[in-house]
């Protein structure tokens, strides 16, 4: 799997492409490690480093011979240099691959940093949206409450009618208070009249009792006088 980055509308977009391997990923790692160590481009054949070693060994052995073998030494030296040149090409390719991998890694890190930045920005935007949502909910609730109050107010009668009703009620209350005051005064007057009547009744009753006592005393006195006269006549 390889990761590539491309810029679309001012932002980096990560493109992931899937590669189908002929070997298991674990085997791939072993093969790649072996190729990097031996500089081989295929899994078959003799490693270039070993071939270079053989060429160098053949050249050294030929040089160590105590014979006039300049032609063979030249031939082996030329073969060794050719093999060395052939071995250098994969090294340059590997170096180019390493540099490309480093550039790709750097690009991947940039994409990663940009992605993390975008994630953090998205999280911040989500938090802001959450706050805005809560604020909008509160505003909506306030609007609904205001609408409910407005409906209640609109359902009430006009102010002029209310003031008229209040005026009529105050007038009725004043009349009731006046009637109550008049009733209280009349009640007080009736209380005083009743008290005076009771006093007069008491005086009449006392007078009648006194008159009855006087009448009884007069009758008793007349009876005694009559009795005395009768007694006197009897004695004569």
UniProtKB/Swiss-Prot annotation:
- InterPro entries according to UniProt: THOC7/Mft1
Gene Ontology cellular-component terms listed: THO complex; THO complex part of transcription export complex
Q: Name one Pfam family in it.
A: THOC7
> From the UniProt record, which GO molecular function terms apply?
RNA binding
Superkingdom of origin organism: Eukaryota
Q: Which residues form a coiled coil?
A: 99-228
Protein's UniProt keywords contain Coiled coil: yes
Q: Which UniProt keywords are present, listed alphabetically? A: Coiled coil, mRNA processing, mRNA splicing, mRNA transport, Nucleus, RNA-binding, Transport
Q: Which GO terms describe its biological process?
A: mRNA processing; mRNA transport; RNA splicing
Q: Where in the cell is it found?
A: Nucleus
- Quaternary structure per UniProt? Component of the THO complex, which is composed of THO1, THO2, THO3, THO5, THO6 and THO7.
Q: What is the role of this chain? A: Acts as a component of the THO subcomplex of the TREX complex which is thought to couple mRNA transcription, processing and nuclear export.
Q: Which family does it belong to?
A: Belongs to the THOC7 family.
Which named protein is this?
THO complex subunit 7B
Q: Which organism is it from?
A: Arabidopsis thaliana
* Taxon lineage: Eukaryota, Viridiplantae, Streptophyta, Embryophyta, Tracheophyta
Which gene holds the coding sequence for this protein?
Answer: THO7B
């Amino acid at each position: 799997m390889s990761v590539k980055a491309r810029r679309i509308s001012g932002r980096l977009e990560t493109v992931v492409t899937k590669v189908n391997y002929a070997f298991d990923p674990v085997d791939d790692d072993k093969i790649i490690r072996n190729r990097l160590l031996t500089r081989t481009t295929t899994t078959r054949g003799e490693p270039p480093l070993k071939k270079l070693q053989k060429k160098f060994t053949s050249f050294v052995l030929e040089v160590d011979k105590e014979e006039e073998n300049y032609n063979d030494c030249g031939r082996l030296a030329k073969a060794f240099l050719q093999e060395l040149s052939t071995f250098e090409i994969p090294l340059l390719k590997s170096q180019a691959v390493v540099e490309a991998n480093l550039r790709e890694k750097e690009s991947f890190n940039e994409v990663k940093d940009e992605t993390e930045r975008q994630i953090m920005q998205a999280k911040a935007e989500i938090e802001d949206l959450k706050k805005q949502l809560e604020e909008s909910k509160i505003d909506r609730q306030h609007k609904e409450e205001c609408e409910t109050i407005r409906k209640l107010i609109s359902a009430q009668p006009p102010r002029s009618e209310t003031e008229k009703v209040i005026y009529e009620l105050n007038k009725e209350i004043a009349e009731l208070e006046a009637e109550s005051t008049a009733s209280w005064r009349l009640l007080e007057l009736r209380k005083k009249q009743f008290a005076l009547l009771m006093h007069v009744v008491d005086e009449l009753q006392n007078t009648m009792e006194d008159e009855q006592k006087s009448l009884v005393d007069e009758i008793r006195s007349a009876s005694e006088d009559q009795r005395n006269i009768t007694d006197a006549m009897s004695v004569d």
